[in-house]
Amino acid sequence: VFVRELVSNASDACDKLRYLSNTKENVMQDDPDLRVEIEINKKENRISFIDNGIGMNRKDLINNLGTIARSGTAQFLKELSESKTKDLSLIGQFGVGFYSAFMVSSEISVTTRKAGEKKLWIWKSDGESNFSIEENDNLDLLKSNRGTKIDILITKENKEYLDKVRVEQIIRKYSDHISIPIYVIDGSEKKDEKNEAINSASAIWTRQKNKITKEQYKEFYNHVGQMFDDPWLTSHYKAEGKIEYTVLNFIPSSKPFDLYDPARENRLKLYVKKVFITDNCPDLIPPYLRFLRGVIDSEDLPL
């Protein structure tokens, strides 16, 4: 859960900086290539999420992370850990995503510097009640002259998140279509070893239909539907109203072997803001359409 949420937050920070660059031309000049890095340090039991997005100042830290000191946070974490339907409910509440990291950590520190500002700040908390914010003069704590680094001290029970392969699997499942490139770096590997972006960074359904070729539709169908044939029919449209959503669905050209099995689940993937939520949502489509393959993505779906 926390991996998906922190990657989404990092991506949002990069998008905010990109938007800011429309009015402030020099804000990205020194470091124009936006990215998200996940660094794993097994020796120190630490995983770090680093972005070169817009960053935060002291006021932003208090407004965005200060609520960690409220008593309701502990109750929220308790409900989240006990929830049997967390894939469909609590996890989808992106506003509280940062707090989910305390489920696997005994301590979190946030090092950040806002774009265009000189001061660097460090926020720390154990997730119990208090947090601290301190100014730091060492600007080399960040790789860029702006952005945020979140250091998470992983508990013994959750060491699976220090496995590079495991983290890469999570990224490919939940954050594959985020437009910002995501890199996973293992601290035990050689420093000169080149890392490639884990995510495909191609949410094809967000593009205009006349910009997508038949071959690109087929490749996406084969990828998302885990099918090897050609789609018999492609349906791609955007619905607007109280809730806006985009649909890219395919009818397979070959009949699934379990088409008439009443226990067969639908294979549509639900996304919110290009972030995967679930592929097990019975109410998404009628049972008689469960042979469909594809995605439904919404910017404002209430989860």
Please report, for each region that a protein language model flagged, where it lies by residue.
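GHKL (Bergerat-fold) ATPase N-terminal catalytic module, capturing the glycine-rich phosphate-binding loop
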Residues: 1-156, 160-161, 169
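GHKL/Bergerat-fold ATPase module in large chromosome/replication-associated machines
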Residues: 90, 111-136, 155-158, 165-303
